[in-house]
């Protein structure tokens, strides 16, 4: 069940233990609801929980029934008990250990956290120190509940040095919980005090408020007696307000607004006041809404000072903003300026300029609404430490009968009487701003000036006539306006005669609107001018109103433009950047063109220009007062061109002047011939920092004896303006950055750091991999060294005797202690099916060839020589065919073998000695046998050589003279190959010689291809070397064998399986 306003009878429905709660919400105790933060009631049977959406972390309020977490869990009520306090009822949520805890307990015990700050669950209790569970609640002791005093965890009094401990819910029932302004982005801290310190804090707060309000008025002319008189008059005002509400359900355009409005104070807290700005009551406040802070006006006209004082004894002050979410760290309103003075309301009845009853609601730091809209709630971000100033429409006819002739500088809230004088609201970022139909709200400016009396009703009738002519109505219906969320911040200029003027930033997050400068100004001759911009579906207009000696001329914005266009203002002095004042409806601006009213005294003008996108019915305006002929005193406000509007030094008014050509004359000249000429500097209008707003700057005079005196400019150069903009932009961002956002940014930063580290590691690994591959590529790209053969026949020839066709399993499972030093590890001789099928009768046997390097060879020579032998590992010889016409040689270049051979001691093969002399014999000491039984090897005499036909040598003798030594050696070896192939009676020794010489020829394919041998002794070398290209790097593919097919009567075949797979695996 959702309610935007709490029914009065709800307290009767609350269970007995919760009846002591002061408000409706079980978390914040506020009994009010808002459209964006409604009060939601649990529909569970017998459950009386009522919470705000933001207080309980409800992401979306359902349209149907809603159940609290306790009712939703359907757990027995006896089992649901808060782990932090002895109370069972209230708004409970699950904890991380499966128990339950109150949301309010989680908020007020500092160590308790929410795992998810948006849903506010689960409640994490693991950080709560044990000491809190050992404390006893003094409230339970006082009320005779000693058995429950030690239950749960207790919070302590926030007064330094006080050791009183109490349960959060006990303090909530007793009204001892409050909120204090935090430092920095932590805008609100949740505090609780014991009864003694809470009462002391309340008293000191009351006194500090009183002193601060007096400091806003003329401190030299007030006495305490007048203070009490004005308080009494204020109560009379309230009664008249009640009658006024009954008489006026609808605002009327003919209403005469009185310039002086009573500002009703409940709690005025300002951040300039160290004590008064701190205490905020939790029970009646609404400071925990995350999305926006909603300005809300009391729904009853009786909520005046008497009510607030009666409630003040119980510690129930009203606060002017709605709930910020109850999250830790995001508890405050979404952007409060802690450093701006916002409270300008006073407990005094304000003087009226006219004796005619008028109804104006002027807000200085709070938003007030029209009578018919009084029960709905405005949504303004005025969270700048101000409690609700409920401005009641005043009928101030008999206020100052006895003081009509006196000049008393009281704190006046002047409304910038534009349009309907019913609502004067200050908006900054309204999410839902409810204005009644026909309202044109105008924000007001708390100023200190003389109260003027004895103004005749004729003047008021003139004001009525001017109002009817010059002002347009805003026709937004109740509910949210169509305007942008980012609307104008209206800067309030508080001017007092003896105290420094504080330009009050009325909007949270409006850093551009507050800048404290000395301006000891008073209203001269009681004249006040207020320039405001109204935005309505019909159009926008700026209305300037003067109260000067009984005349109330009204100047519209077009007159201002015409005056600027006609040269009344210096083009250098009037810097206007006002691209579009017309509201979002798009209709043209019906502004009237007239002359600038002539005033005998210079006036400070300030224009609050509404955002083009803000079609809200509320008119931000800043009424400014005339400086009291003090040359050199200036009112400065921060530049409002932070987010979109810029300081334009050239008058770019062509568009607006074109719009104002068709406007009408609205008024006559004033009394005197002094024009509103612009010299010196002027306050810049405070515009919204979030919308592309226009910035209108008007310069003004400080006249003395009808002569112009130039006021020194606030910023002498554009550099100073930019520097101020930069610093204030930083301040704005700091103030806008709520702790939840900072927490989210820190989490994102942490995630980015983790991801960055992971990517750096990945890059490091990939770089190392790339370097390894580059090294391997460099090793493999080294050309094979030339194989030098020993021509001397003085070597003993060792040859293997061929093993006669051992079965494949004996080949694959042969275990020899010497195999570890060879290229043939166990199980590394697979027999390919295609070779078995292609040569059906061929049998396979393997020869393990390993030639240790000579003793005198250095390791460098060993490693360099190894690369030439890589192909030994992959050469496989099949059956020799009888015809030998189809000799296909695929001797693979095995990659990555050289690195293994160089790295493994004992596996280093030397090139020297592999290929013998020209007779083709192989010299190699037999060190490794494939079978456990040693192989029988025969010694061939060194001079033993295969016979070479002389015809072959003579046939090729003619080509030998043209060849180099290396080519000659290869040629002779080729001749030997042909001799061997022609004989077709190969012994196992010849098989070995043939194998090695084929391997040697593969190292030099280009030279072999260039050999052109005459005669029939030539062998198809290209066929022998087909498929001898090197495989790609780091890929171990099974290479095809050098298969030489024979018929069924062919000789026994020696066949060596491919080793590239195991070798590459060992390399990787």
Curated annotation (Swiss-Prot):
InterPro entries: AF10-like_CC, AF10/AF17_PHD, AF10_ePHD, EPHD, Histone_Mod_Regulator, Zinc_finger_PHD-type_CS, Znf_FYVE_PHD, Znf_PHD. Residues 207-260, 296-416, 428-506, 583-613, 660-698, 786-869, 1040-1068 are annotated as: Disordered. Residues 296-305, 340-351, 387-396, 404-416, 428-446, 595-604, 787-816, 1040-1054 have a biased composition (Polar residues). The modification Phosphoserine is found at residues 217, 252, 436, 532, 686, 688, 691. This is Protein AF-10. A zinc finger (C2HC pre-PHD-type) spans 79-112. Self-associates. Interacts with FSTL3; the interaction enhances MLLT10 in vitro transcriptional activity and self-association. Interacts with YEATS4. Interacts with SS18. Interacts with DOT1L. Interacts with histone H3; interaction is necessary for MLLT10 binding to nucleosomes; interaction is inhibited by histone H3 'Lys-27' methylations (H3K27me1, H3K27me2 and H3K27me3) amd acetylation; interaction stabilizes association of MLLT10 at chromatin; interaction is essential for histone H3 'Lys-79' dimethylation (H3K79me2). Residues 465-483 have a biased composition (Basic residues). Residues 752-780 are annotated as: Leucine-zipper. Probably involved in transcriptional regulation. Binds to cruciform DNA. In cells, binding to unmodified histone H3 regulates DOT1L functions including histone H3 'Lys-79' dimethylation (H3K79me2) and gene activation. It is found in: Nucleus. Residues 352-372, 490-506, 583-594, 681-692, 836-850, 857-869 have a biased composition (Low complexity). A zinc finger (PHD-type) spans 22-74, 135-198. Its main location: nucleus. The lineage of its organism: Eukaryota, Metazoa, Chordata, Craniata, Vertebrata. GO terms for molecular function: chromatin binding; histone binding; nucleosome binding; zinc ion binding. Residues 106-190 are annotated as: Required for interaction with histone H3. GO terms for biological process: positive regulation of transcription by RNA polymerase II. Keywords: Isopeptide bond, Metal-binding, Nucleus, Phosphoprotein, Repeat, Ubl conjugation, Zinc, Zinc-finger. There is a cross-link at residue 280 (Glycyl lysine isopeptide (Lys-Gly) (interchain with G-Cter in SUMO2)). The keyword Protease does not apply. One of its GO terms (cellular component) is protein-containing complex. SMART domains: PHD (SM00249). Residues 223-240, 306-317 have a biased composition (Basic and acidic residues). It comes from Mus musculus.
């Amino acid at each position: 069940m959702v309610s935007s306003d709490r029914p009065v009878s709800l307290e009767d429905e609350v269970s007995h233990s919760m009846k002591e709660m002061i408000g409706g919400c079980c978390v914040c105790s506020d009994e009010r609801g808002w459209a964006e933060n409604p009060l939601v009631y649990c529909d569970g049977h017998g459950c009386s929980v009522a919470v705000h959406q933001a207080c309980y972390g409800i992401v979306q309020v359902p349209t149907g029934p809603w159940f609290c977490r306790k009712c939703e869990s359907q757990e027995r009520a006896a089992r649901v008990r808060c782990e932090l306090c002895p109370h069972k009822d209230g708004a409970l949520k699950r904890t991380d250990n499966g128990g339950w805890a109150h949301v309010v307990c989680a908020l007020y015990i500092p160590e308790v956290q929410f795992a998810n700050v948006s849903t506010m669950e689960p409640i994490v209790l693991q950080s709560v120190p044990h000491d809190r569970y050992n404390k006893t609640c003094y409230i339970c002791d006082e009320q005779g509940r000693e058995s429950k005093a030690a239950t749960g965890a207790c919070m302590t009094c926030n007064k330094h040095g006080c050791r009183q401990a109490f349960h959060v819910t006990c303090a909530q029932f007793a009204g001892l919980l409050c909120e204090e302004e935090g430092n920095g982005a932590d805008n609100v801290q949740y505090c609780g005090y014991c009864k003694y310190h809470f009462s002391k804090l309340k008293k000191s707060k009351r006194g500090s408020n009183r002193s601060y309000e007096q400091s806003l008025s003329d401190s030299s002319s007030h006495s305490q007696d007048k203070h009490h008189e004005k308080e009494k008059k204020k109560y009379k005002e309230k009664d008249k307000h009640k009658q006024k509400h009954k008489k006026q359900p609808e605002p009327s355009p003919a209403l005469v607004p009185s310039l002086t409005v009573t500002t009703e104070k409940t709690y005025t807290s300002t951040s300039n006041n160290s004590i008064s700005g701190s205490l905020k009551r939790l029970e009646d406040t609404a400071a925990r809404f995350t999305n926006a802070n909603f300005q809300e006006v009391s729904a009853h006209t009786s909520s005046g000072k008497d009510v607030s004082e009666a409630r003040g004894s119980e510690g129930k002050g009203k606060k002017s903003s709605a709930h910020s979410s109850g999250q830790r760290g995001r508890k405050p309103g979404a952007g409060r300026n802690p450093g701006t003075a916002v409270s300008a309301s006073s407990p005094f009845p304000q003087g009226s300029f006219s004796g005619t009853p008028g109804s104006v609601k002027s807000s200085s730091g709070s938003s007030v609404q029209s009578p018919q809209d009084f029960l709905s709630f405005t949504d303004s971000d005025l969270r700048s430490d101000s409690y609700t100033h409920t401005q009641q429409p005043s009928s101030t006819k008999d206020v100052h009968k006895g003081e009509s002739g006196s000049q008393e500088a009281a704190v006046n809230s002047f409304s910038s009487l534009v349009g309907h004088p019913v609502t004067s609201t200050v908006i900054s970022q309204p999410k839902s701003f409810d204005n009644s139909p026909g309202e044109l709200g105008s924000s007001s400016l708390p100023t200190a000036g003389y109260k003027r009396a004895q103004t005749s009703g004729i003047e008021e009738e003139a004001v009525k006539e001017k109002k009817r002519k010059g002002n347009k109505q805003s026709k937004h219906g109740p509910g949210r306006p169509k305007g942008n969320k980012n609307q104008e911040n209206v800067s309030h200029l508080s001017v007092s005669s003896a105290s420094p003027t504080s330009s009050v930033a009325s909007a949270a997050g409006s850093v551009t609107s507050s800048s404290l400068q000395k301006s000891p100004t008073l209203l001269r001759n009681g004249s006040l001018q207020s320039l405001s911009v109204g935005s309505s579906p019909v159009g926008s207009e700026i209305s300037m109103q003067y109260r000067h000696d009984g005349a109330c001329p009204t100047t519209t914005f077009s007159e201002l433009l015409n005056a600027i266009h006609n040269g009344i203002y210096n083009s250098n002095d009037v810097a206007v950047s006002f691209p579009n004042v017309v509201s979002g409806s798009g209709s043209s601006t019906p502004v009237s063109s007239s002359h600038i009213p002539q005033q005998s005294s210079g006036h400070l003008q300030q224009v609050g220009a509404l955002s083009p996108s803000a079609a809200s019915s509320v008119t931000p305006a800043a009424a400014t007062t005339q400086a009291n002929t003090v040359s050199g005193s200036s009112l400065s406000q921060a530049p409002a061109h932070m987010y979109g509007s810029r300081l334009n030094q050239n008058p770019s008014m062509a568009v607006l002047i074109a719009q104002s050509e068709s406007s009408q004359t609205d008024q006559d000249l004033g009394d005197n011939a002094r024009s509103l000429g612009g010299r010196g500097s002027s306050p810049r209008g405070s515009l919204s920092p979030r919308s592309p707003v226009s910035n209108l700057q008007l310069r003004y005079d400080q006249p003395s004896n009808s002569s112009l005196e130039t006021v020194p400019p606030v910023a002498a150069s554009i550099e100073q303006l930019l520097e101020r903009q930069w610093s204030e932009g930083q301040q704005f961002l700091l103030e806008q950055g709520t702790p939840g956002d900072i927490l989210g940014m820190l989490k994102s930063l942490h995630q980015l750091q983790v991801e960055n580290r992971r990517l750096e590691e990945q890059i490091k690994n990939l770089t190392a991999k790339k370097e390894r591959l580059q090294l391997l590529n460099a090793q493999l790209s080294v050309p094979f060294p030339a194989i030098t053969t020993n021509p001397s026949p003085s070597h003993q020839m060792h040859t293997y005797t061929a093993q006669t066709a051992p079965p494949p399993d004996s080949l694959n499972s042969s275990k020899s202690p010497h195999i570890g030093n060879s290229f043939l590890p166990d199980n590394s001789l697979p027999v390919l099916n295609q070779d078995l099928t292609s040569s059906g009768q061929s049998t396979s046997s393997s020869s393990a060839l390993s030639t240790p390097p000579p003793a005198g060879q250095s390791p460098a020579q060993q490693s360099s020589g190894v690369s030439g032998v890589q192909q030994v590992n992959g050469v496989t010889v099949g059956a020799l065919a009888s015809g030998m016409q189809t000799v296909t040689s695929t001797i693979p270049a095995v990659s990555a073998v050289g690195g293994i051979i160089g790295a493994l001691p004992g596996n280093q093969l030397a090139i020297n000695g592999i290929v013998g002399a020209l007779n083709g014999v192989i010299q190699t000491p037999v060190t490794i046998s494939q079978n456990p039984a040693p192989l029988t090897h025969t010694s061939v005499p060194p001079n033993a050589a295969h016979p070479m036909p002389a015809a072959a040598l003579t046939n090729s003798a003619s080509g030998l003279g043209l060849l180099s030594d290396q080519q000659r050696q290869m040629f002779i070896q080729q001749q030997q190959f042909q001799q061997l192939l022609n004989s077709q009676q190969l012994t196992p020794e010849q098989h070995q010689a043939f194998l090695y010489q084929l391997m040697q020829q593969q190292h030099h394919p280009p030279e072999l291809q260039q050999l052109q041998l005459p005669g029939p002794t030539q062998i198809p070398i290209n066929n022998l070397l087909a498929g001898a290209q090197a495989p790609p790097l780091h890929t171990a593919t099974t290479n095809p064998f050098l298969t030489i097919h024979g018929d069924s009567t062919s000789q026994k075949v020696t066949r060596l399986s491919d080793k590239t797979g195991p070798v590459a695996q060992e390399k990787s």
